[in-house]
């Protein structure tokens, strides 16, 4: 038996749309948002936006290692490669402030080459010196042997229309 007092009225909204949320929602492109003040495990940003914030007990270990490593070594590389276009942080008066990242790579991008590495630790170590805009790092045992390691513009395709793209 479930008591009716356990149900929440539909008119009660858990999260309120802020001015910053409204400004971000004016952008019609697919991107991610990261709330610097909330931390990686806070899911409130995901209520209105595609976000890299959020908690799940079964979070991908490699993602967590990537986040942990780059959050210490190179935040910009982390945000760019995860398509974080908007960051929410605090200004000097401790008020929420919106920051835009014009260098976000997008949902997908073309690379020139692949560097094969032998272990996840080696992959993390190579992150700090690798231009992820141009080079992909791949675990040696996870890629078919017939995949080329160098690419050029004739290898690209053009996506004309995205169907079923979520605005959120």
Spans of features found by a protein language model:
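Flexible, solvent-exposed extracytoplasmic
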Residues: 24-25, 46, 53-59, 73-168
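Extracytoplasmic
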Residues: 1-54, 99
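Aromatic/His-enriched, Gly/Pro-containing loop or helix-boundary segments
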Residues: 10-14, 61-76
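Generic signal for short, ordered secondary-structure residues
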Residues: 3, 57-58, 66
């Amino acid at each position: 038996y479930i008591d009716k007092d356990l149900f929440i009225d539909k008119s009660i909204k858990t999260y309120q749309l802020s001015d910053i949320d409204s400004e971000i929602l004016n952008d019609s492109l697919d991107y991610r948002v990261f709330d610097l003040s909330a931390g990686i495990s806070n899911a409130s940003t995901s209520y209105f936006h595609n976000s890299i914030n959020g908690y799940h007990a079964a979070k991908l270990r490699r993602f967590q290692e990537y986040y942990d490593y780059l959050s210490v070594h190179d935040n910009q590389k982390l945000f760019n490669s995860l398509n974080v276009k908007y960051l929410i942080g605090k200004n000097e008066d401790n008020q929420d402030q919106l920051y835009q990242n014009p260098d976000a790579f997008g949902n997908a991008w073309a690379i020139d080459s692949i560097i094969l590495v032998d272990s996840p630790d080696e992959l993390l170590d190579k992150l700090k010196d690798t231009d992820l805009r141009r080079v992909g790092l791949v675990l040696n045992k996870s890629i078919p042997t017939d995949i080329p390691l160098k690419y050029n513009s004739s290898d690209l395709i053009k996506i004309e229309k995205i169907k079923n793209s979520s605005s959120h």
